[in-house]
Amino acid sequence: MKDVVDKCSTKGCAIDIGTVIDNDNCTSKFSRFFATREEAESFMTKLKELAAATSSADEGASVAYKIKDLEGQVELDAAFTFSCQAEMIIFELSLRSLA
């Protein structure tokens, strides 16, 4: 990896972060199945806490979710809308801590 960085820096390569993060998509969707409704609700509480910790204190994240009872399992569908795409990316990376 160091060789790539050295070659890139000697040739003057650069990337505009606006090319990567353009704020077109600020919503993260999440879906998971659980054995019980209580497990789904408990996990949703953790997701809300994570979204609150990730989002800016002024605006916060907009959260919409549904918990559906299906035969033998419960489905959690959630959407988290952040004020900017960077917050959404940080939130999605933070989901790894809940795995």
Swiss-Prot record:
It comes from the Bacteria. This is UPF0381 protein YiiS. InterPro entries: DUF406 (IPR005272), UPF0234-like_C (IPR035571). The gene is yiiS. Disulfide bonds: none annotated. It comes from Escherichia coli (strain K12). One of its GO terms (cellular component) is cytosol. Belongs to the UPF0381 family. Pfam families: DUF406.
